[in-house]
Amino acid sequence: MVNLGNAVRSLLMHLIGLLVWQFDISISPVAAIVTDTFNSSDGGRLFQFPDGVQNWPALSIVVIIIMTIGGNILVIMAVSMEKKLHNATNYFLMSLAIADMLVGLLVMPLSLLAILYDYVWPLPRYLCPVWISLDVLFSTASIMHLCAISLDRYVAIRNPIEHSRFNSRTKAIMKIAIVWAISIGVSVPIPVIGLRDESKVFVNNTTCVLNDPNFVLIGSFVAFFIPLTIMVITYFLTIYVLRRQTLMLLRGHTEEELANMSLNFLNCCCKKNGGEEENAPNPNPDQKPRRKKKEKRPRGTMQAINNEKKASKVLGIVFFVFLIMWCPFFITNILSVLCGKACNQKLMEKLLNVFVWIGYVCSGINPLVYTLFNKIYRRAFSKYLRCDYKPDKKPPVRQIPRVAATALSGRELNVNIYRHTNERVARKANDPEPGIEMQVENLELPVNPSNVVSERISSV
């Protein structure tokens, strides 16, 4: 049996040796150092690099580990430093990235070490249940985070007013703490069981794997299948609510446009028949200001719904990837327990060894999903890879003082409005009317033209 210090050094030397050996660098000095260092203390159990043979799967695993750790560190940095990402959903995604990063730091390297030793556990035996517990903890935390995100978004869309009361940063942290508490509660029994009875965590007294059928069944349903069912149901309910809100908004907006057209028609008729428009009787004096408020509301509401749809699309891809990556492992794990000796146990073990690594790969895919489908994450990752860690500064806002009512010609009105806004003007420059009254109040103009211009025009 090796001690913990030698085991850690052995793992590091194996990783270095793999990289050097894989790229055909002269490895005889490295092999000699590794052999001389560990053969004396490791009882001759050091994994030997065969001459002329390259272990491409092992190198691929090393690359996956590096990408998993690096990608999730970028996600954590983006949510921490970008103010645009400071919301409940992204706090959950940052906590999920922490779990995935810990998978790359603590779980994957030990699993690679087990592969290099041909699934014979090379570390102290008491570390086996600890490693299994960490594996279950982070896997459970991943599915619980996705389940919590799905529930939180559904409640936010279904009852936005009620949800806004509980959507502060503190409340989001409390929800994340509950997710981690549930995950810890699922994984804590493993080291307790394993330290009392090593047969529960060792197969053939050599391979470190969870060997308690009851815990495998209960843990699989509690940690995977039940949260997965909740996540899928709430996700489809969210899509349904968004579609219904879109249809209701479009129908309401269409009716409003018809009402506006009717009102404009009445005003034009009154102007032709009665001369001045301001002297024409308005059938509903309150219609005009109310119409102005309604014209702005559908645009903002539709934009909010479109943003929710985009976010739901990204999260849906994350959910789908997680489902595809982890379902094979958990289904095979349950089948191996239910069928017992009727199944080919060697085949089941090989399938589980492959499927568990497919699940590990999921921890490194999420940052790629964010990069492909979210511009804010993509820009943040690009900045950090260039070693630019300065947060984006908000553009300054210029305050335009209140302008008194002034008689302007049509051409002057066009010039002044086009100078301060990109919106089209109702009257053309060659309007035959000599002048019109205009008053601008509370006009805010950001330097960045992409921002929304807020202005109020009356007495036109």
Curated annotation (Swiss-Prot):
Q: Any signal peptide, and if so, which residues?
A: 1-32
- Residue ranges annotated as Extracellular topological domain: 33-56, 113-129, 191-214, 339-349
| Locations listed in the record | Cell membrane
Gene Ontology CC annotations of this record: cell surface; dendrite; external side of plasma membrane; G protein-coupled serotonin receptor complex; plasma membrane; synapse
- The short motif PDZ-binding is annotated over 458-460
What are the coiled-coil residue ranges? none
Q: Report the SS bond pairs.
A: C128-C208, C339-C343
On whether Transmembrane is a keyword of this UniProt record, the answer is: yes
GO biological process assignments: animal organ regeneration; behavioral fear response; behavioral response to nicotine; cGMP-mediated signaling; chemical synaptic transmission; feeding behavior; G protein-coupled receptor signaling pathway, coupled to cyclic nucleotide second messenger; G protein-coupled serotonin receptor signaling pathway
| Renumbered ranges of motif NPxxY motif | 366-370
Instruction: Identify the residue span(s) of motif DRY motif.
Output: 152-154
Could you tell me the membrane topology recorded for this protein?
Multi-pass membrane protein
**Topological domain ranges for the Cytoplasmic compartment:** 82-87, 153-168, 238-313, 373-460
- So where does this one cross the membrane? 57-81, 88-112, 130-152, 169-190, 215-237, 314-338, 350-372
Task: Enumerate the glycosylated residues.
Answer: N204, N205
Q: List residues binding ergotamine.
A: T140, L210
Report quaternary structure and partners.
Answer: Interacts with MPDZ. Interacts with ARRB2. Interacts with MPP3; this interaction stabilizes the receptor at the plasma membrane and prevents the desensitization of the HTR2C receptor-mediated calcium response.
Annotated domain remarks: The PDZ domain-binding motif is involved in the interaction with MPDZ.
Q: What protein family is recorded?
A: Belongs to the G-protein coupled receptor 1 family.
What task does this protein carry out? Answer: G-protein coupled receptor for 5-hydroxytryptamine (serotonin). Also functions as a receptor for various drugs and psychoactive substances, including ergot alkaloid derivatives, 1-2,5,-dimethoxy-4-iodophenyl-2-aminopropane (DOI) and lysergic acid diethylamide (LSD). Ligand binding causes a conformation change that triggers signaling via guanine nucleotide-binding proteins (G proteins) and modulates the activity of downstream effectors.
Q: What is this protein called?
A: 5-hydroxytryptamine receptor 2C
